[in-house]
Amino acid sequence: MLTAPQAKVLLDYDPTLIPVILGCQNHFEIVINGDSIAPQRMTTPPQARQFKTLAAAYSYLRTFLDYRGDVFIRLSDPTTGTGDA
């Protein structure tokens, strides 16, 4: 899992990376290079930061990670838990 500062450095360092906003059953997550963004306070077991809306996830990318590039949006299949919906 990536913290927000780590994600920001990663996106600045490698401009070819494109974040993915993963739409799960009742929330959205941001994935960069296969790693999820960690919440502000780590939980046990670790879970990705969850956003209630697509707009909130996109706003987080633009505001906190200062990212202005392309974004992939992928829906997760609730039966398999994968992005192959």
Listing of model-derived features with the role each one plays in the protein:
Residues 18-46, 76-78:
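Short aromatic-glycine-(Arg/Gly/Cys) micro-motifs in beta-strand/loop hairpins
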Residues 74-85:
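Intrinsically disordered, low-complexity charged/polar segments
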Residues 11-14, 23-24, 66:
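Flexible, charged surface loops at secondary-structure boundaries
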